[in-house]
Amino acid sequence: MTLRACLFALLLLPLAATARDCTPRVKDGWIRLLPGGMPMQAGFGRIDNHCPMPVTIVSASSPAYASVELHESKVVDGVNRMRAVPELRIAPDGAAVLQPGGLHLMLMKPKATLKPGSRVVIEFSLKDGRKLLGEFEVRKPVP
C-alpha cells in the first residue's frame, strides 16, 4: 500500500466510526386500530436517517404481534396492489415516510387486545446487525 493510500485510509477512519455510532430515529409512529378484532393492522410514521451513510432495514418485529412486515401499496393499472418490501434503504440525511397508501408496516395477529392510546414497541433490524426501536401509538381510525 502506498503512503498516499495509507493517509487516505487514516482520514476515513473518523467517518467510519461516526457512521457506525450514528443511529436513525423513528418519529410520529402510530397504528391504525381496525374495528372488530381484525387480524391485521397497519403502522405508520417516519424513520429519519441523519447519518452520513445509508442504512437498510431488513426486518421488523414486535412482542405485540405474531409478525411484522414492511409493505408498499401502489396503484398499478388502476388497481391498488400491496407487496412486501424485502429491504428498505434510507439515504444519508434521508427519511422513509410510512403512510396510508404507500410504505407501511403490516402488523399481523396481535397477541393482545389493543386500545386507543396503547403504546407498542417495534424493533427494526438493520443490515449491519444493529437494532432500532420505535414506539407507536394505537389510534382509532378517522371516520
Model-derived features with residue positions:
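Bacterial N-terminal signal peptides that target proteins for export
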Residues: 1-7
